[in-house]
Each structure stands twice: as structure tokens, then as C-alpha cells.
Amino acid sequence: MDGDRGKRDSYWSTSPSGSTTKPASGWERSSKADTWLLILSFTQWALSIATVIICIIISARQGYSMKEYSMTVEALNMSSREVKESLTSLIRQEVIARAVNIQSSVQTGIPVLLNKNSRDVIQMIDKSCSRQELTQHCESTIAVHHADGIAPLEPHSFWRCPVGEPYLSSDPEISLLPGPSLLSGSTTISGCVRLPSLSIGEAIYAYSSNLITQGCADIGKSYQVLQLGYISLNSDMFPDLNPVVSHTYDINDNRKSCSVVATGTRGYQLCSMPTVDERTDYSSDGIEDLVLDVLDLKGRTKSHRYRNSEVDLDHPFSALYPSVGNGIATEGSLIFLGYGGLTTPLQGDTKCRTQGCQQVSQDTCNEALKITWLGGKQVVSVIIQVNDYLSERPKIRVTTIPITQNYLGAEGRLLKLGDRVYIYTRSSGWHSQLQIGVLDVSHPLTINWTPHEALSRPGNKECNWYNKCPKECISGVYTDAYPLSPDAANVATVTLYANTSRVNPTIMYSNTTNIINMLRIKDVQLEAAYTTTSCITHFGKGYCFHIIEINQKSLNTLQPMLFKTSIPKLCKAES
């Protein structure tokens, strides 16, 4: 052990160079500790100074960064506001555009698509029901009806206002409404399509016209075309006539002077089947055959023909014709207006006017009913009643309208609107002014005529537009009117606005004393003939269909054309 300690002491007392080192004293050790402490203090001070400098530098840099940060935040805020405004504007535009599209779809697109889908379903049902497979056969009727809200215009409901009184306005002027026309026409020239007759029922409408292949003579061989359809709304939200089925009757049957009625899901057509011309017919005893045609929505048709002996006539007639204008349906009966010549004249005093007329008496008016051109026969209007029209063989009864209630018998029509029956007759005699009133079909038959001073029709020189004094004449033209007010004082019509010529067809809305609003179809030289006007409402808004026989000179043909207008009814506020 001692040997090892000697070795260790020898090791620590000898330098690496081989010299011997002496042990350090206590003072020397204290001096070294102070030196190291000084060094540490200086280092700490230096570090503190460096730390302060670094903090100052960092603070300075942080101040600049905060300012830059504030500017950056402000720029970001401005950019955000701009983006927000841009997005808001874009969203607003998109919302408005989509709202307009939605509104357009709701108002127009959806109804059109619904109508199209309805027609597609109807066609599909029709095709499936027309098939016969083994013993199965579909007999159901196609569900066809007017668009929602559409109904024949009923004056009692239409001619009223929530506040104030209704009136016809002259401002703005009426205009033609756009839409298609699907009236039956001709495939040849130099012929005529004549005598349009339109009946608008609660569910469907019926339209009939006569197609003469060559010329326009009444006795010329002709097709009779009967259409059934419904009233829809087009993309402009205006009403249209849309035919569903059409039937063309044999040209060899030669139907003439047809009147129609639409009721339920069927159309009925009453026609004359003359074998001679009109003058020859009036000169002989007995009437030409009548025929009642029935057409349903599946295109099935049935016809009932009646000879003179099969018609229950209240008086002997030499000639009898349906009145061209539409008839009406009541419980168990169809009622048509007719006219014709009595074999033996009735006694009594007819409607007359003597005031302001020279050398005129009641006898003048009575004799004016006997038309020399028609063999001197007394021409009267009649009610043709088809009883039990749903039976296998309906019965026809004819009742003469008393001459005391009427002017010269002529073409015309009946309208059942609400609880009233309105009658129009063509002003064929000396009385040139519009003839429209309310008919009481009870016994005895009576007519309450509404005097109209503003509306008339062209006629021959002796019985022109302005004639008011009684004399024998047969003239005028069929231009019926539709009552807008319950008393038939306010009407819609198409008049040939001329003195003696069948020219210048003009749509007119009028009261008893003034033409309020009118629209000329083209110009005063345009030739035309018969006109018929029928009106409807769509959720209270009134529209009229006007069918006018227009002379197509370039094709040498006469053909009906369809026009539509909106009724210019307004409400006058109470003062």
C-alpha cells in the first residue's frame, strides 16, 4: 500500500516534461477564484447588455410589424367588404333571376306542361280504350274539360264590381290576342266554308261549319264538319279553342243551316237536308227533312232523320230551317231557334214603328212579314224542341213564336246564361238595328227586347244601316251579339260597319246608345259575311271569341277566321 501511495505522489509532483512542480499556496488559490468571479460577472453584464439591446431591437421591429399588421388588416377588411358586396350582388341577381324563372314556370310553364300531360294521358287512354282484346272493351269516356277557371260568361256574375259600378271603357283600345286557330278549313280553292256555329258548354265546346266544294250556293253539295273540344290556356295565358274530335258528314247528305249545342260530353247538331233551293222550298207545302246528329268525345256518331210527318208542328209550314246560331240544353230537352214560312199566315199585330215614318200603319208592319221573293209566305221564328234527346229516338216539337212578340222571322241563336235565356235574331227585315233580348220559354212565349240604337247592319238600299221605317224587304246579314250585362244593354259583337255592302268587319263593344270600343279587322274594303261572338270568363276576367267569314279574294273563297279580344270592362269608383 505504501509503495502505491509513493508512486501516486511521485506522479502528481512531476510535470509532463519531466521537471518537478511545487505545491500551490492558499493565497494563490484565492486570487484565481476572484479572477473567475470577475470574469463571470463581466460575462453576466455583457449578456444583460446584449439582452437589452436585443429586446430594444425586437421591440423596434415589433412596432414596425404592428403598424404593418394594422395596415394589412385594414386592407384585408376592405377586400373582404368588396368580396362581400360582390357576392351579395351576385346572389341577389341569381335570386331575382331564379325567382323570375319560378314565377314564369308557375304562371305559364307549369299550366302548359299540365295541359300537355293531360292531353298525353287522354291520348293514351283513348288508344288503350279503342283496343279490343278478347272480350275486354273499354267504354269509358275521355275526361276532357275546359281549363280550371274557364266558364261561359254569365252576365249576372260578370257585370259587377267589388266597389263601384261596371262600365265598358274606350281606353285602352281593344287589340287582338295571340294564339292558334284550329277551325276546319278547305283543301281546295273556289269553294266556301260557311255558317259557323259555336256552342260553349260547361265542360266542352261544339263547333260546326259547312264546306261547299264549288261556289257558295246553298243547294250546292257540301260537307258538314262537327268538332268537339275544350278551352285551354296558351303560353301567353290567353284562352284557345282546342279540338279533340272531329267528324265530317257525307257530302251526299247535303246538310244545311246547322245549329249546335254542347252539353255534358257530347255535341248535338240540328240541320236541314234540303233537296231543292230555298225559293222552291217556300213555294211548296211541307218542310224538308231535318236531321239530329250526335257526336261524343270518342268520335262515335249517331244520326236521327225526321220527315215532315215525324215532326210535331203547331202550324203547317212550307219551309223550316234551324237558325244557324247555337241552341241551348235544359233538363231533358235541347232547344234550337228556327225560322220558316207558314202555309197559312197567323193573325195579329207584329212589332211595329210608325213614329216619324210617313204613310206607315200597323198593317204595313203586318204585311212586311209576307215576303214576295219567298212566295208571299209569312216568315216567322220558331222554337224547335228536341225532347228526350238521350233516348234512342228523340222527339221534335216546333212552337211558333207569336208574331206579336217578334220582327221578321230570321236566323238567330239562343243563350242560356244563369237563369235567363237570351235570344238574338238577324235583322233581315225593315228593322235594321240589333235585335237582342230575353226570351221567356214558358207559355205563351214572350220576348223582352232591349232597344239598341248604336248597332245595326248593312242592307239593301231600301233597308240599309239607317233604316227605321216599316216596309217589305229581306236583307241584312247574321252578326250576333253576346250579352255582357243582365239586361243585354252592354254587348260584344262583330258588325259589318257599312251602309249597304258586306265589308269592313269591326269588333265592337257597345251599350244601347254608343259604340264604346272597337277594332277594325283590316280596312273598310275587306269583304266579309256572317259573324258570331261567344264570351267566357277565366277566374272573372272576360274574353270573347269572334268568328268571321272572311272573303279570301286571292283564292276566290269564303272562310271563317277566329279572333280573340279581352273585354274592356272596368269599375267606376263611387264618388
Curated annotation (Swiss-Prot):
Composition skew (Polar residues), residue ranges: 11-23
Virion surface side: 59-575
Glycosylated position list: 77, 499, 511
Subcellular location: Virion membrane; Host cell membrane
This protein's GO CC annotations: host cell plasma membrane; membrane; viral envelope; virion membrane
Region (Interaction with F protein): 59-140
Quaternary state and interactors: Homotetramer; composed of disulfide-linked homodimers. Interacts with F protein trimer.
Domain notes: The C-terminus (head domain) is involved in binding the cellular receptor.
Protein name as annotated: Hemagglutinin-neuraminidase
Organism: Sendai virus (strain Z)
Gene symbol of the encoding locus: HN
